[in-house]
Amino acid sequence: MGTKDRILIIDFSNYEDFPIGGYLTFARNMISSFGSDLALAGITTSRNDPVGRWFKKKINNVEFDFFAMARYDSTKTKKIIPDRLVNYLLIKYYRKRILDIGINNIFLQRQESLLALSDCKRNICYSFAGLDNPLVNSKYSYGGLMAHWFEDRFFKKIGVASLILGRGDEKAIQNMLLRSNGSMAGREVIKFPTRIDTTIFKPCDRDKARLKLNLPEGAFIVLTTGRLAWWKGWKFMIDSFMEFLKQSHNALFIMVGEGEDYDKIKLYISENKLADKILLTGKKGGEEIASYLNASDLYIMGSYKEGWPTALMEAVACGVPVCATDFSSVDEIIIEGVNGYIIRDRDEQQFAKGMLKAAQLQKPVKNDHVTRYSTDRLKEDILNHWQLI
């Protein structure tokens, strides 16, 4: 890839470990696939990085052109001002300096990023991380009030993108197109599943994984991974696990991840006297997450909404049986009775029954339908759709 064909990613992350979630995961997959052919604009959590100018930064021993729009404290998960608003204002403020690098191809995956760059006249690839309106279930009380206005404004500007990708199933894509009220008429949204690193997320010996993590050999381990936020359904999963415990007394529920609801979850565990039955591990890296997955007997996900969930893909890639609620793309990942079960109603007793059924499935479960979406093919798949200039 020549100099003129480089790609600039602008995203509200440090491209290493903050903030956790699907945006960061996909950005890191892009880094893994494209390497230093990328230039990165985002935020930094390092005191050593300059802010407001381009500099050279090493990530995973690869040197990148990097532009830090702001410095963040990664230990603070509760913020007064929404990240989306901060991201929009930062891109607007630093826009000229960011674009001065002279790269024509820009990859975006956040709505507010596109709004801030809607008149930049560059070759934009916009990738929907999820197909729902992100403000409908905002943790900020005023977010819902602005949801329709925000999405309407976004739909009117998305026409500037040369290519539009959607990390969701066909139903979610069609629902999104209907919500655009004709603003996206005639535009193709290409279904583009999230990617996983199959060199890390693959079936491995359960006992060795437990020994490595110092986990009890005889316990039935239930696992969930990802951001600890209300829309991930942590309360529903804990309540369902309490029902599951009535039938599986030796069960242990491990929640891997961090997020704004960590303290709430810890308190809820204490109130229900589950401290010896539920383990909060905090943030873990990819290889350690893979070890937890391989050490587990069952993976659960209780989300209210998802795009194309990387965490669920990683679990299936490791051959772990799963039980999940109903959300976009779940039918493309879970094959009922083969690698897991989908519980359509948010009923804790029904979900616990689904967990019991999934627990009977033999490991490793079928996973070839998700391992085909490996990061090894990400670069080729994107460039098959996106003509760089």
Predicted features and spans:
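N-terminal strand-loop element at the rim of the active site
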Residues: D11-F18, S33-I81
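Nucleotide-activated donor-binding/catalytic signature segment of Leloir-type glycosyltransferases, i.e.
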Residues: K266-K284
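Short hydrophobic beta-strand element within catalytic cores of glycosyltransferases
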Residues: P321-A324
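Conserved acidic donor-binding segment of nucleotide-sugar-dependent glycosyltransferases
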Residues: E336-G337, Y341-E348, L356-L361
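Aromatic "clamp/platform" in nucleotide-sugar-dependent glycosyltransferases that forms part
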Residues: Y304
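Membrane-proximal helix-turn-helix segments that form the acceptor-binding/catalytic region
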Residues: K96, G144-L165, G182
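Active-site proximal beta-strand in glycosyltransferases
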Residues: N105-F107, L117-S138, G144, S162-L163
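Conserved donor-binding/catalytic core segment of Leloir-type glycosyltransferases
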Residues: P216-K232, I238-F241
